[in-house]
Regions:
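Nucleotide/pyrophosphate-binding catalytic subdomain
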Residues: 1-136
Length: 137
């Protein structure tokens, strides 16, 4: 079994994520593989920045949040060609985004961002990208 770990730049653009797919397919012909992916390039920083905006009571967090949703949706629209797979993925990703939005709203309301909450927020980057990659490959 081989573990393939891909960092943010490997899942940061359409070109790089399609390259990731080819690498995984080639390795899977030789042996079993486990794929580990980071958040889409730049998303971890965006998640943290959006956390800070919410903590400060700045409603700009909503704009930044929607920009993250749009980026993931555009990636899905571009790389997932099967209509059923794409719709199922949108449902799955949007459910995660609803959870994340609730966490941000809580941070915004109570003006508190514990380390545990921040870790939970950051985890959404990998959770979202792994769903996209799993559907792609």
């Amino acid at each position: 079994m081989k573990v393939l770990k891909f960092g943010g730049t490997s899942v940061g653009s359409v070109k790089s994520i399609l390259s990731l797919k080819r690498i995984v397919e080639n390795e899977a012909k030789k042996q079993s593989v486990v794929v580990v992916v980071s958040a889409l390039g730049g998303i971890t920083d965006k998640l943290l920045q959006t956390s800070q905006l919410a903590l400060q009571g700045d409603e700009q967090w909503k704009v930044e949040f929607e920009a993250m949703v749009d980026r993931h949706h555009k990636m899905i629209d571009t790389i997932i060609t099967d209509t059923t797979d794409r719709e199922n993925l949108f449902k799955s990703v949007d459910a995660l985004f609803e959870q994340l939005k609730s966490i941000y709203f809580g941070v915004y309301l109570i003006h508190d961002l514990s380390e545990k909450t921040q870790d939970a927020i950051v985890s959404y980057g990998e959770r979202l990208s792994s769903k996209i990659v799993a559907t792609l490959i």
